[in-house]
């Protein structure tokens, strides 16, 4: 899926300057846009969110939502005792309210409020199993370009996106085992180390009506 997204983005980029000459006028003629978002941003890479936007000549507002799993494996042991492989699965969910303020035909300032969720069903520490649920709310801001083509398609590239954490909350639920203050502290620490998310070369592409 990621390769398909990158190939489509490359195709859009090649034709940006040819068919997106009047991006401002093309945006003005559209009522609704549907698309996808990806790039060098952990939440977008994992959740592959969909985009619903209401474009305008000077301002565009939108909604972003997606969910996906990040899976990793850890192998421990030795040739004499045998090897054990443990699979970790974290579910990442992206929800955003977004906007773009255009300073010309395509150059723009993207901004918005993001609500990110990271969930794990079975995190284990000292034989105590927990369910972790971490929620973060942050402000997003950046710089980018966006081209809207004569035939209805559009491509946005956010060259840089920063973030500022507004709030976060972790919910830790014991599922099995005997809980102690040490195990609970370890479970809570697992998620509260997370900082605001940022990224670069973030592609948004789709079609408008």
Model-derived features: where do they sit?
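Cleavable N-terminal export/targeting peptides
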Residues: 1-31, 177-178, 209
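Extracellular/periplasm-exposed beta-strand and loop segments of Gram-negative cell-envelope proteins
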Residues: 25-27, 39, 65-95, 114-140, ...
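Transmembrane beta-barrel strands of outer-membrane/channel proteins
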Residues: 36-44, 63-67, 109-117, 143-145, ...
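Repeated loop/turn-to-beta-strand initiation elements of outer-membrane beta-barrel proteins
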Residues: 58-63, 106-109, 150-155
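Substrate-binding/catalytic groove segments of enzymes
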Residues: 147-155, 165-169
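Short glycine/proline- and aromatic-enriched beta-strand/turn motifs that initiate or cap beta-hairpins
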Residues: 20-84, 202-209
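Hydrophobic, lipid-facing positions within transmembrane beta-strands of outer-membrane proteins
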Residues: 32, 44-50, 93-97, 137-143, ...
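Outer-membrane beta-barrel proteins and related beta-barrel translocases across Gram-negative bacteria
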Residues: 91, 101-102
């Amino acid at each position: 899926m990621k390769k398909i997204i990158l190939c489509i983005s490359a195709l859009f980029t090649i034709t940006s300057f040819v068919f997106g000459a009047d991006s401002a006028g093309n945006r003005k003629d559209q009522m609704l846009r549907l698309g996808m978002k990806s790039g060098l941003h952990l939440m977008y890479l994992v959740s592959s969110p969909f985009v619903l936007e209401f474009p305008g000549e000077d301002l565009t507002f939108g909604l972003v939502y997606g969910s996906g799993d990040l899976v990793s494996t850890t192998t421990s042991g030795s040739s004499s005792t045998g090897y054990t492989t443990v699979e970790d699965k974290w579910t990442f969910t992206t929800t955003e309210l977004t906007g773009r303020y255009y300073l010309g035909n395509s150059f723009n300032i993207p901004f918005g409020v993001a609500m990110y969720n990271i969930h794990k069903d079975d995190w284990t520490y000292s034989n105590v199993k927990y369910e972790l649920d971490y929620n973060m709310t942050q402000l997003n801001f950046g710089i980018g370009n966006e081209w809207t083509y004569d035939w209805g398609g559009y491509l946005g590239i956010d060259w840089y996106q920063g973030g500022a954490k507004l709030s976060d909350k972790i919910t830790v639920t014991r599922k099995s085992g005997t809980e102690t203050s040490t195990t609970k502290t370890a479970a809570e620490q697992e998620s509260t180390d997370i900082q605001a998310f940022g990224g670069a070369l973030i592609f948004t592409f789709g079609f408008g009506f």
